[in-house]
């Protein structure tokens, strides 16, 4: 596992026809060794608390960045 990978959430204001503007959260894997984002999933959720819980869990269990999208999909299916 790579202890230097940190999962972060990034808020972004988006627009969708029929909905209007809304805030959603992207989740990214930041590699401290490379000083760069190595994986990102856009527009994961509009629920800030859920995005925080996801990042906390990914950091706690040191999720590999290659599994980020799959882990997010699995967590969203469980809601």
Per-region residue spans from a language model:
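A short, exposed loop/beta-hairpin motif centered on an aromatic-Gly-Thr core
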Residues: 35-53, 57-59
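Short, mixed-charge low-complexity intrinsically disordered segments
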Residues: 61-79
């Amino acid at each position: 596992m790579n202890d230097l990978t940190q999962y972060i959430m990034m808020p972004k204001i988006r627009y969708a026809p029929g909905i209007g503007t809304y805030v959603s959260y992207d989740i990214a894997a930041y590699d401290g060794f490379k000083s760069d984002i190595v994986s990102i999933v856009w527009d994961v959720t509009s629920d800030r608390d859920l995005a925080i819980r996801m990042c906390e869990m990914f950091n706690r269990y040191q999720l590999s960045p290659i599994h980020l999208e799959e882990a997010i999909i699995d967590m969203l299916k469980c809601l």
